[in-house]
Amino acid sequence: MMRWKELLEKKPHAWVKWGVIAACLCIVIAGFFVIRQRAAALPVEQVENPVFVSREEEPEMQRDDLKNMLVNNIVVWGTVQDCSYLRIRAGDSVWYLTTMRVAVDTVIRGEADAPTIDIVSGECYTGEPVPEEEFPVRPGIADCIPGTEGIFAVSPVQAGAVWDIGGRSTAVREFGDYIYRIRCSLQEGSIVYDDLVLPISEVETAGS
């Protein structure tokens, strides 16, 4: 499985020279395929020290919305180990991807067998200029840094799921195994998001 870090590091294959005439021919062929290869590869740019913004108007979440979000996804309590921020320019579209590795301490709802999970969140803007210094993210991501603890609601990336990035079908699993939905805090046995409070037992036992 190719991950985004391999996309950053991917280099074209060397070509073998077969004599003077063959070498010239190989150089021409090699140049053609290198161009094709570079055109096909994603122009992944790792963004250091991004300035986070929320550019999409998020509807105000109600208590039932929060409960449905948690009940219908995998919910874990864990600690952020690593964060990366990627920008991909493709034609008139720009993708902003946040990837996080979270060490799972407790599975509150659903199944997550691995000790760590790789989460991805993506924002795509087409024909809408975003200032170079800005990096759009979903709510709850901006203050995630290594060491941040929280309750994460995620959904597993389905096998074969792809994003169309610049006309290229790109496997979502190149960036993560789970899609970010929301991050909450844990306070006195309850899940808290803004001013909404849900007893953790209400999420654990819903539908049972």
Regions of interest found by a model, annotated:
Residues 73-75, 116, 149-151:
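Intrinsic-disorder/low-complexity, polar/charged segments enriched in Ser/Thr/Lys/Arg/Asp/Glu/Gln
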Residues 92, 116-120, 167:
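"Short basic amphipathic alpha-helical interaction patches in structured regions
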Residues 71-108:
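Structural detector for short beta-strands of small beta-barrel domains
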Residues 58-65, 82-88, 127-141:
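N-terminal post-signal-peptidase region of extra-cytosolic proteins
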Residues 98-133, 140-148:
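Mid-length scaffold segments of soluble, non-membrane domains
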